[in-house]
Amino acid sequence: MRRPSRAALVQALLARQQASARALEAAGAPAQPKAIEARLILLGERVAEAFHRRAMEALGPIIKRAMEREQGKRADAIDELAPEGSAIDRAMRSLESQAASVTIGVASAVDAASRDLDSWNAEEIARQISIPVDSVAPDPEALNEFRNSAVGLIKDISAEQHRRIKELVDEAQTTGMRVETLAKRLEDELGIAKRRARLIGRDQVLKANAKLTQDRMQAAGFKRYRWSSGTDARVRPMHRELDGQVFSWDDPPVTNP
């Protein structure tokens, strides 16, 4: 009787991981990577909400005064923000320092998430290839890469909010944008930042889990793997086309971002 190839074993491993995840979800308990993804998304969204709240506290009174002056004037009336120039400058300088202060605690939260992801991945790999979990070595390089990348990206959420809000306020002052329009666009900035937080959480956990799996499978002697794509709408067309194909860990396919 022929022994299954290593590629076939990897395919079976991935299939069992997916089945295990589906079973956990069906039972009402999210698979660990999904739970960790949700934690990072929530962390990023809280950073976005905290900075947005401070931005509205700083700029809200200025916008309110300008809107009161704007009421009853022609739709093309301009320069209602002009008298607020000094107040706007003070507000933006204050917000620049607050962009960093709202990210206090991000590093420790990401560190905890990375440890949980590493533990889950080690136990899952050990279970699927039937080896003691103690023999699955930790992967400090992959974890450090995950921590540094995730912390940097989540901290940049508020910094990017500050940049975008400053550009928006500068545009309003330069072009004579209606204050009502400025207020609406400032509110929209929170949604933009939260969408970025969701993208960061999903992308970082996906990459980290894939890297941990690759390193541990290679350490166990597996030289090739079978590409297995997800089934949801987020799967890129190129990745869907690769589903089921076998590749070497040392020579992965070139995919479009």
Question: What kind of feature is each model-predicted range?
Answer:
Residues 1-189:
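N-terminal leader/targeting and assembly helices and adjacent pre-domain segments
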Residues 192-257:
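Acidic, glycine-rich two-metal-ion catalytic cores of nucleic acid-processing enzymes
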